């Protein structure tokens, strides 16, 4: 896998150490993602979604990683949205979220 078009290599990592850091949550499960991205803005998320749609690689968005059942893990792309996002809004009866 290589850095997708329109995504900065500064926020995209395929380094094993980064991938292993996101292979665990508070559960007993271990899934190693193909890549880790730390999107900084809406454009990064749009580019990531376009890439995932094109390549059919699943994305998991992770904030705290506190799941006890493995929901915050993936063997696809891990999108860590902990830093830089100041506001959120839950939409569509909890089916989506808006981050700013």
Please report, for each region that a protein language model flagged, where it lies by residue.
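Conserved oxyanion/phosphate-binding beta-strand-loop segments in alpha/beta enzyme cores
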Residues: 2-23
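Short, low-complexity intrinsically disordered segments
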Residues: 10, 20, 76-78, 83
């Amino acid at each position: 896998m290589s850095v997708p078009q329109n995504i900065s290599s500064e926020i995209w990592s395929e380094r094993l150490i980064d991938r292993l850091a996101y292979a665990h949550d508070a559960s007993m499960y271990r899934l190693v993602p193909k890549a880790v991205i730390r999107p900084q803005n809406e454009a990064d998320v749009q580019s990531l979604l376009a890439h995932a749609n094109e390549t059919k690689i699943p994305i998991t968005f992770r904030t705290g990683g506190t799941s006890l059942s493995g929901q915050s893990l993936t063997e696809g792309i891990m999108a860590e949205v902990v830093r830089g996002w100041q506001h959120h809004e839950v939409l569509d009866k909890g089916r989506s979220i808006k981050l700013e």
